[in-house]
Amino acid sequence: MPRPCSVLSLDVGRKRIGLAGCDPLGITVTPIKALHRGRFDDDLPVLQQLCQDRRVQGLVVGLPLDAAGQPTAQADHCLRYGRRLAQALQLPLAWVNEHSSTWAAGERHGLKGDRSGRLDSAAAALLLDQWLREGPDLKPVQGLLGGAGAELVDGGS
C-alpha cells in the first residue's frame, strides 16, 4: 500500500482527460471536472494550477492494457503524456492498468455513453481508489523513462 498523500489521477484520452484527486490522507477520492484536451502546452497550465491548488504530491496515470495485459494502441500515447506531464510538474508518478475502468465507471454511476467528461473523471476516480489500495509507490519520472516498469497495478475491475 502506498504512503498516503494528495494525488491527482488521470484517465488520458484523445479528447478529454478524466481527473480525480484524493485528500492528503488518502481517505476521500473525488472526481474533478474533466479537462477537454488541447495541445500539451495548452493542457499544462490548467494541470499546473490544479496541482498547485490541491497541493498534489504525485500523479497516477491510467495505462490502457488489454485483457491479456498487453499495451493497447492508446498505451503509448498515455505513457508519453504521463511522463511528459510528470517531468513538467516535477512530480513522481505511478501507472495503473485501466483495463475496463471506463466500463466499470459507466456501470457503477449510470454514465454509459456520457460525453460530458463525467465518465472519464469517474474512471479516474476508480483508478485512484485502486492505487490507494494496492500501489505501486510513486516513482520519480527519471526512473520510469525506459517503460511502464514492472510495478503496475492490474486494476480496472
UniProtKB/Swiss-Prot annotation:
A Pfam short name: RuvX
Keyword Transport among record annotations: no
Compartment(s): Cytoplasm
Coiled-coil positions: none
EC number: 3.1.-.-
Primary location: cytoplasm
Transmembrane segment boundaries: none
Keyword Hydrolase in record: yes
Entry GO MF terms: nuclease activity
InterPro entries for this protein: RNaseH-like_sf (IPR012337), YqgF (IPR005227), YqgF/RNaseH-like_dom (IPR006641), YqgF/RNaseH-like_dom_sf (IPR037027)
Keywords recorded for this protein, A-Z: Cytoplasm, Hydrolase, Nuclease, Ribosome biogenesis
SMART domains in the record: YqgFc
GO biological processes: rRNA 5'-end processing
NCBIfam families, sorted: RNAse_H_YqgF
Family: Belongs to the YqgF nuclease family.
Function per UniProt: Could be a nuclease involved in processing of the 5'-end of pre-16S rRNA.
Name of the protein described by the UniProt record: Putative pre-16S rRNA nuclease
The organism of origin for this protein: Parasynechococcus marenigrum (strain WH8102)
Lineage, broadest ranks: Bacteria, Bacillati, Cyanobacteriota, Cyanophyceae, Synechococcales
